[in-house]
Amino acid sequence: MSATALRIAPIASRTFQRRLGYLLAGVATGAAATVAYKAQKNNNYYKYNNNNNNNSGFKAGALAAAAGVVHLAHEEDKKTADYQKVYNLIAERLRDDDEYDNYIGYGPVLVRLAWHSSGTWDKNDNTGGSYGGTYRYKKESQDPSNAGLENAAKFLEPVKKQFPWISYGDLYTLGGVVGIQELQGPKIPWRSGRTDLPEDMTPDNGRLPDGDKDANYVRNFYKRLDFNDREVVALLGAHALGKTHLKNSGFEGPWGAANNIFTNEFYLNLLNEDWKLEKNDAGNLQYNSPKGYMMLPTDYALIQDSNYLKIVKEYAADQDAFFRDFSKAFAALLERGIDFPKNQPVHIFKTLDEQGL
């Protein structure tokens, strides 16, 4: 996961062949609710014009009482064994193609793709997020915050060709699960049912976090994603993986030594390294340590804020606590904005090692 993970027509309808509705949900009137119900029953989705001129998300409008959209996951028609096969192919490619990024491998960038494709969600109108798999479109893939993620997307394309029934939203998020688990991280509960949406449903750029801000920015940014302080600190612990790249984010360096193993090292380094604020070759300020590690200002903000600091210390002292909280928070991030059927199964995948592969 790179630094940019912190800088982080008239109403129309088309028929889906799968049991899915992309629906406008009425918030106060029975009429709007009836429209939504009929749309789902007829296997249609409704959309409204995006005349937004800022980064706060789509404007409500086309349907009188509508304030947001509903992302309905289609009912499961595959079993855990089917998705385990997809998992295994991603994991095998991860294991075999290990020279990427100076032998860091593809794990961290797969986690970053899952994070970024999910992190565009806005709780105010339920737009964005992982549901529609919209990273595959130019508008989202060329968001400056997503620089470098084309490598992860290309890595996953052969998997999509072998398993064409999986949606891009499911593929991108499952790739992140593989990245965490195969790099010795915790189990990540995962549910399928995302459905690819058309290009005009791509969220606006500017929804991903910046890396050069303070604790107030971090807290306010994550409010849009509906995360509390503990979940924020847990999610940022994914920076144990990978490194920053000047050409992608404007920052340079690894967060620690074990950058392809998922541990609580991020918190230990925050507390124990001799950090100095310095300007890098791009002219951006970052915290550097004598060991060659770096922290973004938004990383360092976690020890400048008293509430965040308590949690950093807890995770530094107890990796199991970090793993438990990260698993819950990351699974929640991947599902933000999606309504799953009550009986939708939760898949828990075995690693290649656990399968003896």
Swiss-Prot record:
GO terms for molecular function: cytochrome-c peroxidase activity; heme binding; metal ion binding. It is found in: Mitochondrion matrix; Mitochondrion intermembrane space. It is an enzyme of class 1 (oxidoreductase). The active site is at H116, W255. Its main location: mitochondrion. Residues 1-23 form a transit peptide. The record marks R112 as: Transition state stabilizer. It catalyses: 2 Fe(II)-[cytochrome c] + H2O2 + 2 H(+) = 2 Fe(III)-[cytochrome c] + 2 H2O. Destroys radicals which are normally produced within the cells and which are toxic to biological systems. This is Cytochrome c peroxidase, mitochondrial.
